[in-house]
């Protein structure tokens, strides 16, 4: 396969690679990217890949992701690769990992759950299954699949 640079290099920031084709928009959504951001975001959708057939690639200039953002990406793209770019070079590269518990990153779909009341309780979910993705609230035991999580 011929190597072609489809999106220009970034000086500093984050590259999210190996996102399943079509899920890049969802990744951008959970990262809170919107029209008023003060950094450049590039999204390539349906890029040919030897490993995956097709994939999405996201480049975010001048922004580095925190643990909660990486956890959210792992829910959408469990095999995504994160590259930290500094001065046009890869300074760090790693694959996201789906944690055994997600604390404070999602909202429980059960409106009666204690995490959705005025109580100062942070949401907490355990991973029941990775394929297909199923998580369970540790407080009310409501289970949610991928469609429940991102709608």
From Swiss-Prot:
Oligomeric form and interacting partners: Contains catalytic and regulatory chains.
Record text on cofactor binding: Binds 1 zinc ion per subunit.
GO molecular function: metal ion binding
Protein name: Aspartate carbamoyltransferase regulatory chain
Single GO cellular component term: aspartate carbamoyltransferase complex
NCBIfam families: ATCase_reg
Residue numbers binding Zn(2+): 108, 113, 137, 140
Record organism: Thermoplasma acidophilum (strain ATCC 25905 / DSM 1728 / JCM 9062 / NBRC 15155 / AMRC-C165)
């Amino acid at each position: 396969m011929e190597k072609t640079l489809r999106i220009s290099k970034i000086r500093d920031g984050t590259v999210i690679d190996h996102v399943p084709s079509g899920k890049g928009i969802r990744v951008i959504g959970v990262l809170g990217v919107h029209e008023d951001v003060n950094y450049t975001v590039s999204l390539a959708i349906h890029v040919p890949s030897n490993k995956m057939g097709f994939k999405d690639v996201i480049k975010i200039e001048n922004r580095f992701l925190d643990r909660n953002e990486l956890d959210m990406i792992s829910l959408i793209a469990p095999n995504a690769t994160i590259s930290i770019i500094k001065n046009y070079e890869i300074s760090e590269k790693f694959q996201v990992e789906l944690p055994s518990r997600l604390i404070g990153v999602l909202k429980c779909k059960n409106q009666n759950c204690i995490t959705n009341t005025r109580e100062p309780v942070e949401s907490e979910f355990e991973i029941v299954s990775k394929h297909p993705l199923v998580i369970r609230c540790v407080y009310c035991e409501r289970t949610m699949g991928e469609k429940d999580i991102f709608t």
